[in-house]
């Protein structure tokens, strides 16, 4: 729980706008037909990263705290911490641009095509005015 609080503090670090084409999705809706100009924001990324870093901590709170301290004190932690912070910033950005549901393909932080993680299909729907 303290770890989540620690990570939430990194949400206030400035985040650069993600111009271009961005697929907002999760592991159950993999992106398709990505272009060189497109990028992916994994909305389940923070949880998946934390799970991969911390694994299954012990049920005993004292032992779990010790395990977490060992991870946080490891030489790999600064890089892992930055990865988690970046993943949270991307999720916050999705919320800031008003993303209502996912998967979605967002063009220039303005136009969203919901219900697909396929960049080509989203571009076609967008060019047809959503018809």
Predicted feature locations:
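Sec-dependent signal peptide recognition
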Residues: 2-11
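N-terminal signal peptide c-region/cleavage motif recognized by signal peptidases
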Residues: 14-16
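Local sequence-structure signature of Cys/Sec-based thiol-disulfide redox active-site neighborhoods
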Residues: 18-58, 107
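Extracytoplasmic/secreted cell-surface and envelope-processing proteins
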Residues: 32-33, 113-115
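Aromatic- and Gly/Pro-rich amphipathic surface segment
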Residues: 55-85
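Thioredoxin-like thiol-disulfide oxidoreductase module
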Residues: 76-100
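A short, hydrophobic beta-strand/beta-hairpin element that forms part of a small beta-sheet core
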Residues: 102-113
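C-terminal partner/receptor-binding element of secreted or periplasmic proteins
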Residues: 115-131
């Amino acid at each position: 729980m303290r770890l989540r609080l620690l990570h939430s503090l990194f949400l206030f670090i400035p985040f650069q706008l993600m111009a271009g084409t961005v697929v907002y999705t999760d592991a159950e809706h993999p992106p398709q037909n990505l272009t060189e100009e497109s990028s992916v924001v994994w909305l389940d990324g923070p949880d998946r990263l934390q799970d991969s870093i911390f694994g299954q901590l012990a049920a005993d709170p004292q032992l779990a705290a010790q395990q977490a301290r060992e991870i946080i004190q490891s030489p790999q932690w600064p890089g892992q911490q930055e990865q988690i912070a970046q993943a949270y910033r991307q999720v916050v950005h999705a919320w800031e641009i008003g993303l209502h549901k996912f998967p979605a393909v967002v063009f220039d932080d303005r136009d969203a095509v919901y219900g697909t993680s396929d960049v080509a299909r989203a571009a076609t729907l967008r060019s047809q005015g959503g018809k």
